[in-house]
Amino acid sequence: MIYEQRIYKAVPGKLPAINARFANHTCEFFKEFDIGMLGFWNDEIGASNQLTYITSFESMADREKKWAAFSAHKPWHEVRAETEANGPLVAQVINSFMELTSYSPKPSFKTTLQEKRVYEAMPGKLPDLHNRFSNHTMGLFEKHGIENVAYWTEVVGTSNRLVYMLGYPDLAGREKGWSGFQSDPAWQTARAASEENGALVRVSKHSMLRLTEYSPR
């Protein structure tokens, strides 16, 4: 299974129109062409003007076939022309292809608030990072009320990243969960042991996301 993450950076003021187009048209076209839809999110914190969504396919060949059919679909062209009569809605598209790690659960959502985290591993340390998550971190997350949604690695290009998603009941639950996790002696012991020969993560980025009303659950 291949997952495609797409981030649409909207033209200023056009994010509501992008969401409306997905809700009223694009999602139905995706269903028509059997494009799997994991979720659609807007940023929860900060003045964001972007939509993040993740689709799924059986393979890269399956993705190319279905995306080509969708892109050539006359009703899609008509909707796009109508919704962009006063100018384009999307200023930039950023996409990446991913596959689930061997230890990842099947992606599903218990809440509407997720956190996407991207870890750029130190050179040669990605396997050690995977081991720490599978053997320690995931269990500690669950212990502290943090939902493990999914864990991915990128499959196109030379990537040294781990992309994962967590779930929370609300922002207060996020702060409580992370506070408990970070102060847990079991985490501190696991981290110290795994970093005996140096840090595993070079750069980390995270964003808080809220499922849109039209997103699958």
Task: Place the predicted regions along the sequence by residue.
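Surface-exposed interaction/gating patches
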Residues: 2-17, 100-167, 171-172, 211-216
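An amphipathic, aromatic/His-enriched active-site/gating alpha helix that lines ligand/cofactor pockets
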Residues: 16-38, 45-47, 56-97, 131-149, ...
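Alpha-helical scaffold segments that form or flank carboxylate-/histidine-based iron centers
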Residues: 48-52, 160
